[in-house]
């Protein structure tokens, strides 16, 4: 009975003071890296596996602005562009998705997928506006992990990257993230 009374009173004091007790053992990132390093040295883990694990941890510290395709390298289509002009541009620069803008890149109208272009480009009354899809936007200072979560939950493979003023800074794709992990 005395031990029970002592335990109960100790728990009551802990609850009243707001202290939290934890019996869990928490493993840090550095401990995991050390275990992986030791496994690699012992031959239990391949170096390529160690490299991927380290890249996963490093990816958590990165922002999408550091892995995106910059706006200066971005191929985009003008909303009123002719079918012939689009065809030539796409032949030279094959991508899965193209931003579509009005007059300048910061005036995004939406995006168009390559497969939609193939399906409609030869139609006599082709208009880019007819096959537009809504664009997805991510702030450039968003973490890669957070972006990956959005890409996964929204079932999309890209996002246009904006600065704090809403200007387009580039595009990030699921492929960019995979390239950082495996590249």
Stretch-by-stretch model annotation:
Residues 1-16:
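Hydrophobic alpha-helical segments of integral membrane proteins
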Residues 19-183:
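Soluble cytosolic regulatory domains appended to membrane proteins
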């Amino acid at each position: 009975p005395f031990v029970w009374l002592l335990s109960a009173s100790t728990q009551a004091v802990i609850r009243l003071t707001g202290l939290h007790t934890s019996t869990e053992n928490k493993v840090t990132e550095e401990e995991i890296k050390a275990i992986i390093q030791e496994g690699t040295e012992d031959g239990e883990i391949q170096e390529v596996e160690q490299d991927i694990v380290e890249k996963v941890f490093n990816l958590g510290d990165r922002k999408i602005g550091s892995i995106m395709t910059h706006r200066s390298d971005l191929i985009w289509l003008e909303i009123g562009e002719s079918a012939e002009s689009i065809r030539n541009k796409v032949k030279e620069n094959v991508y899965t998705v193209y931003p579509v803008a009005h007059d300048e890149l910061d005036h995004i109208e939406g995006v168009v997928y390559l497969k939609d272009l193939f399906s409609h480009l030869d139609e006599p009354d082709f208009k880019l506006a007819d096959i537009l899809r809504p664009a997805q936007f991510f702030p450039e200072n968003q973490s890669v992990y957070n972006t990956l979560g959005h890409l996964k939950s929204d079932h999309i493979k890209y996002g246009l990257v904006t600065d704090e003023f809403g200007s387009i800074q580039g595009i990030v794709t699921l492929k960019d993230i995979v390239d950082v992990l495996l590249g």
